[in-house]
């Protein structure tokens, strides 16, 4: 059976055979090589030129040439042998410690002792200049120092934010309770957990109201911040005793206009039984005042028990000498059970601190 010859084995006549005598190999003799990704073709490298400064030729010195060292000074000449002696005497010392010891010893030498080493250093300098007339000092490039790790500034920002927030709270607190001319923080009279809010009041100092405000039912806070706490409690006493001496219409006006200090220690207008006396509640906000405005007298009076306050608010009808208004009864501090609220304990302490309430008549 005859097989046809494959096409790649045939010799096709080319038109350049008669013109050019160059022999062209047949197509089947040239092996077809496909480029593999593992062996990429090497790029053509430029041929090095004998002229310096071109291509890959070194421009300063040949790699094989040794580096020319600087001539030694007088200290180096003296320390060359002295370092060996110290290293033999103290083999456990570090090289840096030896260098410090050598430097201190060189400073302690006199000029006469340094003279031979200075002369030897000058001789070496002249010899070095003769051996290398074209020598130029080229310091080695220093190694790049390791970059210092950047400290995360988030704790600092948090601390600064906390400090700024504390200062903002202080400024808000200063706006709510202006001082009587003192700018120190001590004059705020802020109670600590170890003291009661009533401890900042001096019992010997009497309460004072202007003459034009004695006849009014609601005297304004005519005191500094330290007396603002007491005035808030006096306000509570007057509000409790109002049903016996004033009409409900006046009472509604009192309940709708609480003082800022009373709101500071009791922002919700109720009994602060859940908050210790030594701790301060957050500063008052506008929503608390608006919520207090919407409450009626009946809702507020529902939280009070008149029978409980009658045993603490027995005020005398007699007037003290020198005071044009009734004076509260001076009595010994009473022991209050633990089950009662902290508001009752605060009012019992207030009754012993010479608070004067002109509105209470019975």
From Swiss-Prot:
Keywords: Developmental protein, DNA-binding, Nucleus, Transcription, Transcription regulation. It comes from the Eukaryota. Residues 68-136 bind DNA. SUPFAM superfamilies: HMG-box. Residues 135-149 have a biased composition (Basic residues). Residues 149-209 are annotated as: Important for transcriptional activation. PROSITE patterns: HMG_BOX_2 (PS50118), SOX_C (PS51516). GO terms for molecular function: sequence-specific DNA binding. Residues 235-361 form the Sox C-terminal domain. Residues 1-13, 59-68 have a biased composition (Basic and acidic residues). Residues 1-68, 129-159 are annotated as: Disordered. This is Transcription factor Sox-18. It comes from Xenopus tropicalis.
């Amino acid at each position: 059976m005859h097989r046809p010859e494959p096409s790649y084995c045939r010799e096709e006549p080319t038109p350049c055979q008669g013109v050019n005598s160059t022999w062209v190999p047949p197509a089947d003799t040239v092996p077809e090589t496909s480029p593999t990704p593992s062996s990429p073709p090497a790029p053509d490298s430029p041929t090095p030129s004998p002229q310096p400064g071109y291509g890959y030729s070194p421009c300063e010195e040949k790699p094989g040439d040794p580096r020319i060292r600087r001539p030694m000074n007088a200290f180096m000449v003296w320390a060359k042998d002295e370092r060996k002696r110290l290293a033999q005497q103290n083999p456990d010392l570090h090289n840096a410690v030896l260098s410090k010891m050598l430097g201190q010893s060189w400073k302690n030498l006199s000029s006469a002792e340094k003279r031979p080493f200075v002369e030897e250093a000058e001789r070496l300098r002249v010899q070095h200049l003769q051996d290398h007339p074209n020598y130029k000092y080229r310091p080695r490039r220093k190694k790049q120092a390791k970059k210092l790790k950047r400290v995360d500034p988030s704790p600092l920002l948090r601390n600064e934010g906390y400090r700024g927030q504390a200062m903002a709270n202080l400024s808000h607190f200063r706006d709510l309770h202006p001082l009587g001319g003192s700018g120190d923080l001590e004059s705020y009279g802020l109670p600590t957990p170890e003291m009661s809010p009533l401890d900042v009041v001096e019992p010997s100092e009497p309460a004072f109201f202007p003459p034009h405000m004695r006849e009014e039912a609601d005297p304004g806070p005519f005191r500094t911040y330290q007396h603002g706490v007491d005035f808030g409690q006096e306000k509570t006493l007057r509000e409790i005793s109002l049903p016996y001496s004033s009409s409900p219409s006046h009472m509604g006006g009192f309940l709708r206009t609480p003082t800022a200090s009373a709101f500071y220690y009791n922002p919700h207008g109720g009994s602060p039984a859940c908050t210790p006396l030594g701790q301060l509640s957050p500063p008052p906000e506008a929503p608390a005042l608006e919520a207090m405005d919407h409450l009626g007298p009946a809702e507020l009076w529902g939280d009070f028990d008149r029978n409980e306050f009658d045993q603490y608010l027995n005020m005398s009808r007699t007037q003290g000498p020198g005071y044009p208004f009734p004076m509260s009864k001076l009595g010994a501090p009473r022991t209050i059970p633990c089950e009662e609220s902290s508001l009752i304990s605060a009012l019992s302490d207030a009754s012993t601190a010479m608070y004067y309430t002109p509105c209470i008549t019975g």
